[in-house]
Amino acid sequence: MISSLLKKVFGSRNDRLLKQYRQTVARINALEPAMQALSDEALAAKTQEFRDRLGKGEKLDDLLPEAFAVCREASRRVLGMRHFDVQLIGGMSLHQGKIAEMRTGEGKTLVGTLPVYLNALSGDGVHVVTVNDYLASRDAGIMAPLYNFLGLSVGVNLSQMAHDDKQAAYACDITYGTNNEFGFDYLRDNMVFSVDEKVQRKLAFAVVDEVDSILIDEARTPLIISGPADDNIDMYQRMNAVPPLLKRQETEEGEGDYWVDEKAHSVLLSEAGHEHSEEILTRLGLLKEGDSLYSATNITLMHHLMAALRAYSLFHKDQHYVVQDGEVVIVDEFTGRLMAGRRWSDGLHQAVEAKEGVEINRENQTLASITFQNYFRLYGKLSGMTGTADTEAYEFQSIYNLETVVIPTNKPMIRKDSQDKVYRSAKEKYDAILADIKDCHERGQPVLVGTTSIENSELVANLLSQAKLPHNVLNAKEHAREADIVVQAGRPGMITVATNMAGRGTDIVLGGNPEPEIKAVRADDSLSDADKNARIEAIRAEWKQRHAAVLEAGGLHIVGTERHESRRIDNQLRGRSGRQGDPGSSRFYLCLEDPLLRIFASDRVAAIMDRLKMPEGEAIEHPWVTRSIENAQRKVEGRNFDIRKQLLEYDDVANDQRKVIYQQRNEILVEEDVSDVVINMREGVISDLVDLHLPPESLEEQWDLAGLEKTLASDFLLEVPVAEWIKAEPNLDIEQIRQRIVDMAAAAYQAKVDQAGDGVMRQFERSLVLQMLDNHWREHLAAMDHLRQGIHLRGYAQKNPKQEYKREAFELFADMLERIKRSVVQVLMTVQIRGQEDVDAVEPHALPDFEMQHAEPGSALGDDEDNPLSPEALASQGLRINRNDACPCGSGKKYKQCHGRLA
C-alpha cells in the first residue's frame, strides 16, 4: 500500500531511469544536424578522434552522446536504418551494464550497435553473445559494414573453427559468437601449453542477446570439457536388459519396483525393486550369488543400473533427444535445437545409446568445467537484451547484479491475448486447435502454432496434413530451412508449426518478407538495371497488397498447444505477434493431460469440471483458471531458481579454486624459467618431510630417523646419513638438519642440470609443472564431483551440507597442492635427462582428445538418482520429518518452506 503510494508520488525506479535517459537522448538529437553535415570521411574519422580523447583521460560516459550520434548517422548511411529514440535509451542501459527488456520487433540487433561501438573504442574488445552460430554469423554479416565504415574490425567465433581463425576473430574490435563457444574457449585457453596457443584476450565487455535464455535457462547446465576414461562399454549393453524386467509403480506407494518422480526428474527404486534388481543381475552374471548391490565392490553396478533406469523412464526419443546417423543427439529443452557434439554426463548418455541400440561411446572424465554464472561474471562489464526479462528481474539482480530496465515500445502494443481454454482430454484440445487454425486459414490470417517438443510439433503437423491444411514445420530437425520458414511465416493464410521460438532471432513480417526476393533480383546478372528496378517495384507492390490483407485479417495469430513450465517462454511465443504496433492475437489451448497441469493443477481443475457437469468438447475459459496455471508456473520457476542458486553456491567454492589454479597456470605459461618455483617446491616438500619424521618441539627419542632416511632414499634418490650426523654432532637441532638436507638436494639437482644443460632442464621443469598441475586438477575435479554427490546426506547428521562442502573442498584443495609439489619434486629428483630429445619426447605439444559436454541440468548439484531430500525418498526410508522442523538439506529453512514444499 505504502510502496504503491510512493511510486505514484516519485515514480518507479524504471521511470526515473527513463527520465534520465531521455535527457541524454535530447543531447544526442541536438547533435544530429551537425553529424548529417559531415562527409563520410569526416564521420568515419570521428572514431580516431574519440580514441585520442580517451587516451587523454576522457571517460566513455563523456563520449556517449557524441559517439551515439555518430553511430546513428553512420547506420542511416550504411544500413539505411536510423535508431529511434527508444533504441537510444536501450543502448544507454546496455552501456551502463544493465539488461534492456525490449519487445520483439523493436530492433534489438540495431540497439546493440550503440554500446558496442562506444565500448570498442577502448581497444579491449567487445563480445556480442548470441544463442547459436547462425545468429552470430547473420548479425555479424549485417552489422560488419557499419562497423567497418567506422574503422572497427569485426570477427565471428564459430564452433569447429580452426585455431588461427579463432585467434583472428578474438583479435578484432568486436567479436560475435555463442555463449557456449566463448565459455569453452575460456576453458580451452586454460589447458594450453603455450601462451601463443591462447585465443581469448581480456574479458572486458559482453552484450548478451536473448540474455534470459543464456543466463537463466542454461545456467543450470555447466560447461564441461571432458576426455575419455577407461570404462566398460559392455556393462551398458548388459544393463540395458534390466529396466524392461522391472515393474513401474502406478502410484508412489503402489506395487512395483520403481517410482518415477516427474517433478524432481528422478527415479527411485523401492525395497522390492532392490531385491528384484539383485535377482536379475545375479541371473545375468553381473552380481555374485548372495552379494548385495550396496557392497563396496558393486558401487559401479548401482551407478549403471540407475543410469539405465533413468534412460528408460525419463528420457524419451524426439523429446529429449533424436537418433541421427547412428548417434544420440540431445535436443535443447529451451530452444528445441539439436545440440550436436554435446553429451549428458554420469553415464546417462551411454545408457541412452544402449537403449537405442546405437554404438556406445566411452564414459568421460572431466578435464575442466565452469557454469555460465561464473563465466559471465568474469567480464569487467556485462549487459543483455531480451523481450522477456521482467519476470526474472530478481534473479538477474541477485545472481549477476544486473538491473533490468523495461524500455518502452516505439508504438503502442495492440495484440489481443485471450484467456486460456482448458479441455478434459488431449483429443478435445487438438480438435479445438484444428478448428481455430482452419478458421484463420480460411480468413487469410497467418498462424504460428507453438509446441514444447519435437514430438508435439510432429503430432500437430500430422493432424494438419490429415485436414489437408498446407503448413511448414519448424523444429530442430528442420535446422537448415529455419530462417526461410520464419521469414515467410507472416504471409496470408500461412500456417507454421514451431517448437520453442526462443532465440529464433528473425522477425515475422506481416505479408512475408520481400527482401530475399529483392536480393535475388539484384544478384541476377542476366537482368538490366531497368528490368531489376521494375521487378523490385512489382515485388514491393505485391508485398503491400499481402501486408494489407494480413492486417485486415487481424495480423499474426499465435496458438499455444500447451503451457511451458516458464511463463517467460510463453511470453516469448506471444511476443512473435504484435511487433511495432501491428495487430495480432494469441490463445493457449490446454488439457488435463498436459505435463504442467497433470503434475500441478489437474485435480483442482477436474473437480471444477465435474461440479459444472461439463459435456465433452466444452472448455473452461476463466481468468481464475489462467491465474491458477500461472501460479503453478511460478512454483516451477521458483524451484528452478532455487536449483540455480544452489548450483551457484556450490560452484562458487570450485570457482575460487579454479581462479587460483588458472592464475598459477598462466604465470607458469608466461615464464620461460620456473626454477624459482621448483626451488620453493623442493624446499617445501623437504621441510614437510622433516616435520613429519622429526616433529617440532619433540624429544630426540621421538624422532624417526630411519623413516626419514628411507623416504629420502626411495622417493628422491637422496642418501642422507642423518643418524650419523647426530652421532657425530649431538647438539645438531632440527633446523640445521633441515638446511643440510635442503642443501644436499640442491647440490644433487644441480648435478643433473649440469649434465643435461641449463636450457634443457628449464624447459623440462616448465613442462613438468604444467602437466602435474593439469593431472592433479583433473583428479581433484573428480574428487569434488564425488564429494558433491553425497554431501546432502550430512543433513541427517544435523550438519550444514554447504558448510561441510566448503570445509572438505578446502581440505581436498590443500591436499591437491601438496600432491602437486611432491609429484614435481619426486620426478625432478629421480628422472634421468640426457638431452633435448628426452624433453621433446615427454613434452605435450597439443591438447588431449576431448569433447564439450552438455551436463544434465542440476547434475552439478549432485542430484543423484536417490535424492534423499525428496518427500518420497524420506518416506521410503521410514523417516518422518515434521513440517516445522529444519530441512535436512541444510538451507536453514523449515522443511515445509524448502523441500517439503515440493510434496
UniProtKB/Swiss-Prot annotation:
UniProt keyword annotations, A-Z: ATP-binding, Cell inner membrane, Cell membrane, Cytoplasm, Membrane, Metal-binding, Nucleotide-binding, Protein transport, Translocase, Translocation, Transport, Zinc
UniProt cross-references to PROSITE patterns, sorted A to Z: SECA, SECA_MOTOR_DEAD
Listed cofactors: Zn(2+)
Annotated ATP binding sites: Q87, G105, E106, G107, K108, T109, D507
Catalytic activity: ATP + H2O + cellular proteinSide 1 = ADP + phosphate + cellular proteinSide 2
Topological relation to the membrane, as annotated: Peripheral membrane protein
Cited function: Part of the Sec protein translocase complex. Interacts with the SecYEG preprotein conducting channel. Has a central role in coupling the hydrolysis of ATP to the transfer of proteins into and across the cell membrane, serving both as a receptor for the preprotein-SecB complex and as an ATP-driven molecular motor driving the stepwise translocation of polypeptide chains across the membrane.
NCBIfam families for this protein: PRK12904.1, secA
Protein name per Swiss-Prot or TrEMBL: Protein translocase subunit SecA
Organism: Chromobacterium violaceum (strain ATCC 12472 / DSM 30191 / JCM 1249 / CCUG 213 / NBRC 12614 / NCIMB 9131 / NCTC 9757 / MK)
Gene that produces this protein: secA
